[in-house]
């Protein structure tokens, strides 16, 4: 009985450039020279990332796992796992590396313990590539209500002078009877719906940007320049900025020490008797201050005082002398005057910042400030055109934008980054030691996604890698078999380059005879 052998024809395309290379610094800036490389898709509900000096990319997952992408082996390893609760959007929510990570292997995490109603900010040591749980040094902890959802923020970032910045949310339910305006419900048993207990409370760690200076023994001290005196007489001494709703993603300019964060705003779609419509904000703190929530939003637009028992709408809050008279307030009544948001935009078009126009949801995030370095020897570092630029991004609207800053770190220009590419819900980003940008794309839904990935964005100088497309038709069958292969769609980004094509066959050792190849133009 005759037998029929089944084989698979495989092909690869080798494209070689036949032109001379140009100097890395000679070519003018071209936006088309940005290239995306997918590093891994092995991420499940990723939150934050941090890039080590050796290029290792650490990232955390909401479920409590700390993972690392090895740039040499191109693989993801589990570094460790923290016991957490994920109820009410809690979990492992913050990550940063010590400024001297190469020497001490210290990593900082913000997480939600199952046996404590709040958040822990702790330092751990990585030993032989694994998280040493016994090395934990608890730097700070603060309580939250877990009766109702939400707003935990969680972002961590070091400043240039060794200060650790900690973002905390207002821990307030955004819905209920506030109707998408200021959640200031003072009725009994309604504290989860009152942000005056947290963001506007000088005695609360919630709804804040905190600032401490970790010490080598695992304790911390209060640096100069925070909002309140170090003795705690006017408020928590760790508070750098108050009046925050949900500062979900934060970064610190590593040259100036200026703090940026994205403030996810409330849901009101239009102005009303209770006050202004909802806005998302990008905030900039050149120094300590009150950023207004829940009394003010955007460029200090005031909300109205509301009696939630009767529904009566009272006067607008006084922007010159805000007062917190909520029964849920445990701090000072008289508050510092608010600071306006740096950038802000509603659901609909923004008359103040048309570059941020868009529709649909809003989730403003603040990424890193890029500083170009002549001394950095790298063929992929971002060009000088992005020097002194803040990268902001939108989880809901799928974009990254560049905010160019002037010499005073004020707004100069906003432009869309890589306009030809749609980012799939960017959730965190950081520049690596080589000047490339690392980005986590969360994926399409608020859950576990098949399109989650970690990418690196390089700026390619000189000659660029061709875009290779190889397709195969009729590649499986019985002998004799005619297979059609094609390189249609292959092109070179440098138009004057010539390409050399080479087809190679693999897995042919067990065949009786080498296949006959016929090529066409």
Kindly label every feature range from the protein language model.
Residues 120-157:
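Asp-box/WD-like beta-propeller blade repeats and closely related beta-sheet repeat scaffolds
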Residues 498-521:
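Surface-exposed, flexible coil segments in extracellular/virion-facing regions
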Residues 463-471:
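Proline-enriched interdomain boundary motifs that mark the N-terminal boundary
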Residues 47-50, 96, 157, 251, ...:
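Conserved beta-strand position repeated across blades of beta-propeller domains
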Residues 474-483:
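Short, solvent-exposed loop/linker segments at the N-terminal edge
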Residues 38-43, 80-87, 140-147, 239-242, ...:
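Surface loop/turn motifs at the tips and blade-to-blade linkers of beta-strand repeat domains
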Residues 486-495, 506:
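Acidic, Ser/Thr
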Residues 26-30, 90-92, 170-415, 424, ...:
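Beta-propeller domain segments
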């Amino acid at each position: 009985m005759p037998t029929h052998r089944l084989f698979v024809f495989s092909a690869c395309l080798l494209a070689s450039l036949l032109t001379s290379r140009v100097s890395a610094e000679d070519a003018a800036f071209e936006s088309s020279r940005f290239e995306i490389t997918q590093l891994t898709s092995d991420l499940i509900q990723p939150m934050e990332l941090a890039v080590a000096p050796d290029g290792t990319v650490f990232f955390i997952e909401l479920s409590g796992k700390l993972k690392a992408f090895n740039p040499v082996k191109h693989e993801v390893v589990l570094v460790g796992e923290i016991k957490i609760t994920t109820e009410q959007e809690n979990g492992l929510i913050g990550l940063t590396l010590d400024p001297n990570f190469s020497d001490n292997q210290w990593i900082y995490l913000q997480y939600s313990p199952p046996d404590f109603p709040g958040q822990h900010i702790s330092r751990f040591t990585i030993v032989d590539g694994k998280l040493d749980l016994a090395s934990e040094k608890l730097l700070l902890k603060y309580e939250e209500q877990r009766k109702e959802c939400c707003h935990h923020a969680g972002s961590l970032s070091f400043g240039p002078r060794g200060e650790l910045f900690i973002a905390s949310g207002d821990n307030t339910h955004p819905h209920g009877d506030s109707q998408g305006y200021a959640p200031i419900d003072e009725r009994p048993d309604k504290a989860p719906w009152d942000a005056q207990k947290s963001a506007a409370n000088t005695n609360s760690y919630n709804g804040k940007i905190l600032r401490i200076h970790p010490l080598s023994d695992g304790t911390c001290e209060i640096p100069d320049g925070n909002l309140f005196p170090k003795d705690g007489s006017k408020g928590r001494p760790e508070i750098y900025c108050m009046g925050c709703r949900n500062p979900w993603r934060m970064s610190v300019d590593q040259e100036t020490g200026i703090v940026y964060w994205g403030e996810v705003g409330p849901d009101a779609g239009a102005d009303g008797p209770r006050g202004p419509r909802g806005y998302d904000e990008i905030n900039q703190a050149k120094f300590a201050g009150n950023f207004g929530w829940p009394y003010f939003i955007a460029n200090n637009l005031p909300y109205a005082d509301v009696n939630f028992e009767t529904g009566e709408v009272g006067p607008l809050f006084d922007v010159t002398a805000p007062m917190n008279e909520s029964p849920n307030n445990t701090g000072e009544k008289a508050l510092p005057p608010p600071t306006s948001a740096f950038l802000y935009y509603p659901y609909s078009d923004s008359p103040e910042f048309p570059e941020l126009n868009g529709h649909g949801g809003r989730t403003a995030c603040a990424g890193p400030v890029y500083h170009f370095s002549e001394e950095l020897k790298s063929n992929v570092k971002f060009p000088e055109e992005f020097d002194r630029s803040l990268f902001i991004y939108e989880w809901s609207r799928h974009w990254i934008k560049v905010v160019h800053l002037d010499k005073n770190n004020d707004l100069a220009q906003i432009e869309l980054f890589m306009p030809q590419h749609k980012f799939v819900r960017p959730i965190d980003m950081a520049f690596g030691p080589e000047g490339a940008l690392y980005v986590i794309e969360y994926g399409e839904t608020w859950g576990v996604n098949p399109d989650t990935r970690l990418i690196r964005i390089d700026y390619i100088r000189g000659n660029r890698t061709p875009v290779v497309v190889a397709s195969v038709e009729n590649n499986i069958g019985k002998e004799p078999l005619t297979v059609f292969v094609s390189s249609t769609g292959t092109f070179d980004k440098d138009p004057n380059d010539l390409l050399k094509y080479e087809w190679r066959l693999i897995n042919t050792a067990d065949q009786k005879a080498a296949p006959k190849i016929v090529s066409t133009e």
